[in-house]
Every structure is written in C-alpha cells, then in structure tokens.
Amino acid sequence: MQIDVDPQEDPQNAPDVNYVVENPTLDLEQYAASYSGLMRIERLQFIADRCPPLRVEALKMALSFVQRTFNVDMYEEIHRKLSEATRELQNAPDAIPESGVEPPPLDTAWVEATRKKALLKLEKLDTDLKNYKGNSIKESIRRGHDDLGDHYLDCGDLSNALKCYSRARDYCTSAKHVINMCLNVIKVSVYLQNWSHVLSYVSKAESTPEIAEQRGERDSQTQAILTKLKCAAGLAELAARKYKQAAKCFLLASFDHCDFPELLSPSNVAVYGGLCALATFDRQELQRNVISSSSFKLFLELEPQVRDIIFKFYESKYASCLKMLDEMKDNLLLDMYLAPHVRTLYTQIRNRALIQYFSPYVSADMHKMAAAFNTTVAALEDELTQLILEGLINARIDSHSKILYARDVDQRSTTFEKSLLMGKEFQRRAKAMILRAAVLRNQIHVKSPPREGSQGELTPANSQSRMSTNM
C-alpha cells in the first residue's frame, strides 16, 4: 500500500521561526538600499532580531531611516532595542572596548517636534477632506482620502491608512483610479501581512478593463502595474505555502518594469521565484518556464548563485547544487518573507533531486547515491525510507546490500484492470444513451420544481410527467 502525502501539508514541514544566524555574509548597506519606506525599516528590524552580529548596525541604520518619517512610536521602539543590544554587547565576556559603541541619545526634541508636525498635518488634511465633501467633487474627495492614507502610513498607523485607501473606492471615476486604489490597499495589506486581502485586491485590479481587456503588447505603464500585481500575489501565495503558484506569479514579472522598492527588489523576485520553481516544477517545467525564459533570465543575472543552483539541478549535479544551497542558507534566513519557508523549500528541493536521480534506474547503489548527494549511507537510507512511505518513490530498500530497487509493476494485470474499468464505463454510457432514446421516443417531459421565491404557476414539489403514446 502506498501513502500519498502532500509535502506542503505535512506537519513536519511547519515553518521554523526559532532560528538565529551567526555567520551572515550580507552587505547591510547594499541590502537596505534596495528598499524604501516602511519595508526598509521592517527588514532591518527583522535582521536585527535574528542576527546578533548585525544587530547593532541594523538598528542604527533603521533608527536613521525612521527619523525621515513621522513614525515616532517606531523611533522610540528601535532606540530601546538599540540601547539593549549595546548593553548586551558591552556586557559580553569577550567584548572589546571600542569607540562609538554607545547608542545615540533619545532625541526628545525631534520626538516632540515630529508629533506636533504630524498632528498639524493630520488636522489640515482632515479639514481639506471635509471641504471637498462639502463641495461634492469626487476627484478631490478621492485625492483627499489618498493623502490622508499616505499620512497615516508615514506615521505608522497602518489600520487607519488601510481604511482611508479603501474609502477612496467610492469616489473612483475611472479604471485608472480603481487600479491606484487597489495598489494602495495591496501595499498596506502586505505590511499588515493580510494575505487574503492582498489576493482579493489583486483580483479586483486585474479585472479592471484597463488590465483585463488588453491583449498582446501592453504599454509600459500597464506592464509595470501587472508586474507589481503579480509580485504581490506571489508574496501572498508564498505566505500561504502554495509554492508552485507563487513561482508562476514571480515568473510573470517583467524585469524592465520591476521598480517598487516599497514592496520588494528584483533580487527578491529572482530568489523567491527560483527556489519555489526548484521545489515544485518538474524537469520539463523548469526548462521551459525558468531556464528558457528570456524575461526571468534577467532577474537571475542579479542572483548568479541562484542561477547556478538551478542549472546544476537541471544538469543533475546534485552535490554541487545542494552545497551551494547550504552556502546561501544563512542569508535566506534573514529575509522576512522567505525565512519561515526555507526549511520546507530545502526539503522539497532535496526530495525532488532524490526522486529525479532514481527515476531512470531499475536499481541504484546507495553508496554511489550517497556520494552524489554528499551524505552518508545511513542518512540517505532514512531519507529514502520516508520518501517510500509518502509514496513519492515506488521502490524498496535492500538494507543488507544497500541497494535501492524499483518495484516491478505487473503490466499485464494493470492492462486487464484498465480494460475492465473501460468496459464498465462503456456499459454505463450505453445504458444512459438507450434511456435517453426511449425518453425522447415516448415524448416524456419532466418538470422540475420551481425555485424558492420564483414567480409563476405553483406546481407540486414532486416532478410531474405525462406520457403520450403514438398509436
């Protein structure tokens, strides 16, 4: 008996959130420069929480970036974290006295001044919106809601920002306005990690005439919008652990129009799309949709390590492929959207490699197989046992000789079983056709009961029939 288990629903593949990265190879300045706004600050905070060696540097950078906004609460929170991280660094047994270890003092003057500015701007925007509503000018009201949403977003009040952007929907007078509203809601929903909301508004934006009715060549603006929508949908599918669907979304992104640092960078598209494709695509899909894709090749040029991993996997050089995956694992664990899925994706990629390696053979020497996967025979045997139990490999293991044998399928019995099933299906269809012919010949009419709440003549709940026989 074989057990068919969906690896994405396997409880063993639950996301691992308790991880610490001790040996990062990340260039923090270059990484932060790829993002803007709240996304940059949140990613730096995520790195600070998961990587002790980069904690102080990441928090200092986040502190300087947050001072360009009205987000006073986040400034105070980051400053508190930075003070704690600095004290931990100073109290460490192997701490080396350095200059500049002390965190900058809390800028109370900036805090007070920024709070006042934010309040004054909020009052002005609120007054303007009331005036627009008094004049009943839809376009002005829509812009007023958008401006108010932008201000709340700058202050870090995401729930109110979402409300303001959503309210603009009632005042949209064109498809362009609807798309702009959807993009604003999607952006805030990504920050809130409300993924069902993201997919809902991606669908709304794609159904607007400006996007849905265009075929063939799209103009630059439409292509940019579509790329943004596909990337947002990809993030949502990734969060839902629907990796194949996420890969398809990222593969539809256009490199020339991928410019929205408030959500993600082109490098993210390459990494997310590449790893999800490796974990879920078969050999033909990988060749057709990734390796031969002229558009996605441009993304992979930004991440040569991911590109090399994909090519090594396709060329069946699994030891090199898995070694390169391990080398970049620490950096992937510092990505706030990919980190919870790294273990699951790596497991699925390795399982797919094992399945692909064994598929052409009737038997395989597990010693050679272990060498190809850079592992021990005992560890390989455990992996293969799990794959057999899950029904992913139809084989049996000779533990004494350390040989993996493919199970022989009795083609004769299989053919007979298929023939019997087809015969039963033909009988069922023939009986249905004879019954239909008899009904038509005898002019039998069956009235269905009326639907609840429908108007017209009332008929009994049971179907009525009448038969007229031509003599």
Swiss-Prot record:
Entry keyword annotation includes Nucleus: yes
One GO CC annotation: cytoplasm
The keyword Cytoplasm is assigned to this record: yes
Keywords from the named record: Cytoplasm, Nucleus, Phosphoprotein, Signalosome
Tissue occurrence: Expressed in the base region of the oxyntic and pyloric mucosae.
Region (Disordered): 445-471
Function in brief: Essential component of the COP9 signalosome complex (CSN), a complex involved in various cellular and developmental processes. The CSN complex is an essential regulator of the ubiquitin (Ubl) conjugation pathway by mediating the deneddylation of the cullin subunits of SCF-type E3 ligase complexes, leading to decrease the Ubl ligase activity of SCF-type complexes such as SCF, CSA or DDB2. The complex is also involved in phosphorylation of p53/TP53, c-jun/JUN, IkappaBalpha/NFKBIA, ITPK1 and IRF8/ICSBP, possibly via its association with CK2 and PKD kinases.
Domains (record comment): The PCI domain is necessary and sufficient for the interactions with other CSN subunits of the complex. Mediates the interaction with CAPN8.
Subunit structure: Component of the CSN complex, composed of COPS1/GPS1, COPS2, COPS3, COPS4, COPS5, COPS6, COPS7 (COPS7A or COPS7B), COPS8 and COPS9. In the complex, it probably interacts directly with COPS2, COPS3, COPS4 and COPS5. Interacts directly with inositol kinase ITPK1. Interacts with CAPN8. Interacts with USP48. Interacts with ASB4; this interaction negatively regulates GPS1.
Protein name: COP9 signalosome complex subunit 1
Organism: Mus musculus (Mouse)
